[in-house]
């Protein structure tokens, strides 16, 4: 089960997300995560409209299945998803 405390150790694909702070204002978007790489998150914002957001310099707000919202700095997510799941993070 995904919780606020273990979100960074789970897959983001399928979660609702909004990008609240980014260097490019046109990338302030809200949608569903459909893919993730080491440096980017791909979001489906409308039907069949996909946007690629750089992780570095962005702030993401993920909505968990329970309805809770979690804000995460994209700079700490800039590692491969499969490595992030295994990595231990310091409490923030």
Swiss-Prot record:
Q: Which GO terms describe its cellular component?
A: cytoplasm; ribonuclease MRP complex; ribonuclease P complex
Entry's family note: Belongs to the eukaryotic/archaeal RNase P protein component 1 family.
Write out the catalysed reaction.
Answer: Endonucleolytic cleavage of RNA, removing 5'-extranucleotides from tRNA precursor
Has UniProt tagged this entry with the keyword Nuclease? Answer: yes
Q: Name one Pfam family in it.
A: RNase_P-MRP_p29
Please give the function described in this protein's UniProt entry.
Part of ribonuclease P, a protein complex that generates mature tRNA molecules by cleaving their 5'-ends.
Q: Which Gene3D superfamilies match?
A: Ribonuclease P/MRP, subunit p29
Query: How does this chain assemble?
Result: Consists of a catalytic RNA component and at least 4-5 protein subunits.
Instruction: Please name the NCBIfam families in this protein's record.
Output: RNaseP1Mthb
Origin superkingdom: Archaea
- Keyword Chloroplast included in the entry's annotation: no
List GO BP terms, alphabetically.
rRNA processing; tRNA 5'-leader removal
For this protein, the record's InterPro entries field holds:
RNase_P/MRP_Rpp29-subunit, RNase_P/MRP_Rpp29_sf, RNP1, Rof/RNase_P-like, Rpp29/RNP1
Can you say where in the cell this protein is located?
Cytoplasm
The molecule here is called Ribonuclease P protein component 1
Q: What is its main location?
A: cytoplasm
Q: Which GO terms describe its molecular function?
A: ribonuclease P activity; ribonuclease P RNA binding
Q: What is its EC number?
A: 3.1.26.5
Q: Which UniProt keywords apply?
A: Cytoplasm, Endonuclease, Hydrolase, Nuclease, tRNA processing
